[in-house]
């Protein structure tokens, strides 16, 4: 409907929360493909992790604390243990890779982590949309690039 009206969507979401599973994450990637939104989603969006401040009640969730490092005042919260995707996206953005290429790398890494075959991506992943030079999201753990800019 919005495409037919010439309106570009730039969806935002927090990919990693205490309730995110690897299967759920892959399902999110599959949905972005189905909706042809790959070119509409900034690569950093694919690795955004919920900011967990000191004293958060979320730390009481069974098994969640094990996914975090101790509180780090420089990061304004508890850094998440799994940094693979964040490092991949940071390297890709530093190289100014197209969104399609970053998504393909995330797609492959995610499927490999789940020990699943990596399905080939379709040619049409959506159209490029107007965008800002630096996406920033509230409630998300800051990226290294954002921390260095202070």
Predicted regions and their residues:
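Conserved C-terminal portion of the radical SAM core fold
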Residues: 1-55
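Radical SAM enzyme core and accessory elements
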Residues: 57-150
